[in-house]
Amino acid sequence: MRIIPRTMSTQHPDNAKVPEWAKSEVIEGEDEVKEAFLAYSMYGVHEVMWDAEGKDVDTHVVRKLLSNYPDYFREHILGKDVFLTYRLPNPKVEGADRKVFAETMESIPITYDLAEKFYGNGITVPVFEVILPMTTSNLEIISVARYYEKAVANEDELELYDGVKVKDLVGEIYPKVIEVIPLVEERDSLQNIDNIVEGYYKVIKPKYMRVFLARSDPAMNYGMITAVLSVKIALSELYKLSESLNFEIYPIIGVGSLPFRGHLSPENYEKVLEEYKGVYTYTIQSAFKYDYDYDKVKSAISSINNSRIGPAKILEKYEEDVLRKITILYTERYQPIIESLANAINDVSVLLPRRRARKLHIGLFGYSRSAGKVSLPRAISFVGSLYSIGIPPELIGISSLSNLDEKEWDIFKQNYVNFKHDLQTAARFFNWESFELIKDIWKISEDTIAKIKEDIDYAESVIGIKLGGIDYDSRKHILMSSLFLLSFKEKILQESKKYLYEMALIRRSLG
């Protein structure tokens, strides 16, 4: 059995600080290859996700890793000891990137040939897994697996002319199959994930399966509580399915540093391990790696790598029904407020520092079936914008919990163990002065302000959260938030950008 990675380094551009080795503030090109090597060698991460979604991808990464760092990769075999996993564009959703999908798939046999030359015949398959984002059905991942088998691996048998086959020209193509990891991001897809996985299992018959649960995009689209509970439902469903099919499923969770995006940081990783029992692989995003002291980062990654994997909590039907009900109530409260704040979010997001060479890319919210009225930036910029205007998104929609009876509240608390801790961490950055300023700058309606105030009041009076600055850093952040809004109002944008950067440094994450 292969090693299942416990940590996966990603290229999410959520870091406030720029790492010392980067040639510029925007990490791109050769720097991303170096970053992949450092993730393995310096930080001890088991796996690197190589992202072809929403950016120009370097499909020669394996060649560069093996040729630039031969000593390391002779000792640590790529595909056996450490892993490189491609994140594809979803051709069903990202029409402009369909050919990037094809190009990335076509590069997999090249990596095989390179590894054969480097390691010797049959030693390793360096890239054998791909991640498909925004997966909503089993047909999508079945199509990806079959596309590779039929359109890539089997093309060596095509006859060109007069008995001459493709393999006579370019050699045989390996590997013959790849493993597809669905990245599930929509609320309904997360809550019905068993249908996606079981359908794929019946057709493809894999020996095991890795399933990637998004935690960040669902929070942006449906609210933080909906995202957490949807992941809990998904974990329960996956473990039940694993038992019934007698088939190993290894969940991955995509988590960032701030509470809204998962709260996995070098200072909070133990609580995240406690919260998401049953998860095998945790994403180590850029803020985790670059916004904290190196020794603390390396120690945290080592602890995650060596932590015990507890079984996921299996939900009874009545518990699952309650959690589903909460996600609906919460989202109904959360989404209209976000729609009203969309102009503010979009205006602020374009001023945040850029950390990756990514193409412009709207988030799922822009074409979400449940709230298709507005387009928003990607989750990192979304979160950074709301923190910067002094309204952490973790607080939005909270008062919907007032609809729960005592039994429902108990079920909620049992299934979101660190709810109060996450909320308190975010609430330190709430700025009371924001209301008047955002009303003045973006003409935010009294109704929206009143709804946010209800959420704030509920967090304070019912949950017992202390709002606003409670230490030097949070008070400084609140002051910077007011200064940012004032400078933005006066169109002094260079100062606005400076305050945004300073706040990100305090949070230890852009968003």
UniProtKB/Swiss-Prot annotation:
It catalyses: oxaloacetate + phosphate = phosphoenolpyruvate + hydrogencarbonate. Transmembrane segments: none annotated. It holds the Pfam family PEPcase_2. Its EC number is 4.1.1.31. The keyword Ion transport does not apply. Keywords: Carbon dioxide fixation, Lyase, Magnesium. Coiled coil: none annotated. GO terms for biological process: carbon fixation; oxaloacetate metabolic process; tricarboxylic acid cycle. GO terms for molecular function: magnesium ion binding; phosphoenolpyruvate carboxylase activity. The keyword Magnesium applies. Its cofactor is Mg(2+). Belongs to the PEPCase type 2 family. Catalyzes the irreversible beta-carboxylation of phosphoenolpyruvate (PEP) to form oxaloacetate (OAA), a four-carbon dicarboxylic acid source for the tricarboxylic acid cycle. Homotetramer. This is Phosphoenolpyruvate carboxylase. It comes from Saccharolobus islandicus (strain L.S.2.15 / Lassen #1). The gene is ppcA.
